[in-house]
């Protein structure tokens, strides 16, 4: 088992290597372990309500849409909703479908004063495989981490 300190150092090194504006980037397994080990850590799932309902949810995650369904319009209340549900001092892990929206959400959170933000690489479903299908290459579900059907 890797210690919390080791995981956060690895995530921070990725952030430096990739020139990310937030604290770090974690694989789904690493993120799940950080969530388990870090007191008060919060996992914020920024997918849409449709994705939570039709694709699946992570039990215990805070759910705040980064973009709204249908139309994928930016959620103008994202930061206000984040402030209502997550303390600015908390370690915050951002998760989306494949790691793109969560990257934007983590960046926005840092700009809003959240100093301990991490992106979950690969997201909930991971990237598409050679046949254009998700959940076969990377992602929270593919890693066998806790989730439930919406």
Give the ranges of each region predicted by the language model.
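Rhodanese-like catalytic fold shared by cysteine-dependent sulfurtransferases
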Residues: 1-41, 49-91, 102-150
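Conserved G/P- and acidic residue-centered "switch" motifs that form tight phosphate/ATP-binding loops
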Residues: 45, 99
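Short, surface-exposed ligand- or partner-binding patches at beta-edge/loop junctions that are enriched
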Residues: 94-95
